[in-house]
């Protein structure tokens, strides 16, 4: 059964009020002065004789599209995507694996075994809901809290843990901070820390794909509500709209930009309201509902492949601390965290949905959690034993052919280490 959401796609009666999904805001009422329309190149709009300043209250709020309620029940059967069993189980097992990896690697950092970590608690539904609706050939520009997308696409726990430990098998050669993953094989562009830099890059990549004859790929760009406050976000939105790029802009609005709540980040109706203002089809979705996210991204991908950019604001809650460098209880009450953990868990919602379909039970849950935990523990123990990359990796593989300036530095470093090797833990690194 085809999904139909949006102005010409909504068929759910209870969501008639949500007819702006993947479209534009309700326009404020205007009084036409004789039907005269302006001919200004900057805006073709009707003339009025009554002056009126518009604000955030001049428009209806963009509604939140959802498929499941808090208990994992389908609200309207017509919106159930009816995903096949194998895909549903892959989605759920990915969420469980991610949760176990987060728990163990977070504690690993606390024990001093890795330098840094960021968890994904509360946002797992956004990861698997979106990943399951994309083609593996679609290009991913992520921020730093989308690991579930990588797991769903086939990146292994070994690859992810090696990256966090920065050993010689780290695909990034030990050059990045932990959780800054990337994989050319899985069409995932390497993560960088500065907020929002990936947004105009993603749109540029989408523009390049658009120019490929018979293109069948789109780009999805993940970013948070904090990144949406950066100037690069506006540039990316406008770039995508004016050049009709095949891109999905996926905002994870989890309520906090480190310690800054959304109430201090913006006025108006959230991040989603910026889409219609710039001419981008927009939908706001319940990010704790993996099925709703799947539906939204599946339809958004269809639009993107027709060179119609889409903005999705996935509403969620960051259950964990921003990172291991943060203590979120200093700026939000513990009761708030507990409420969201108990009542709006994306993992729990999907598990209850699977149980009602007869795809899951308590024994399967116990076995899945055990296997996920054992995989991470075993991989972590192996990663710790591996040596760090050869020191020459600092200088190699930067240019295709090493320029004389870098060759000179390498020679100097080599002589220095020969002379002062006792001052460096060279046994911990690979050597020739």
Q: Could you describe each region identified by the protein language model?
A:
Residues 187-388:
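Glycine-rich ThDP/TPP pyrophosphate-binding loop and its adjacent helix/strand module
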Residues 75, 115, 125, 282, ...:
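Residue-level detector of short coil/turn "hinge" positions at structural boundaries
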Residues 100-103, 107-243, 261-272, 277-279:
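Cofactor-binding active-site loop characterized by glycine-rich and histidine/acidic residues
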Residues 2-3, 9, 20-145, 430-432:
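N-terminal amphipathic, basic-rich helices that act as targeting or association modules
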Residues 25-61, 66-68, 303-432:
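Glycine/aspartate-rich loop-and-adjacent alpha/beta segment that forms the canonical ThDP
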Residues 73-74, 147, 254-257:
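A short, flexible beta-alpha/helix-coil linker loop
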Residues 61, 85-89, 98, 102, ...:
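Alpha-helix initiation and N-capping motif
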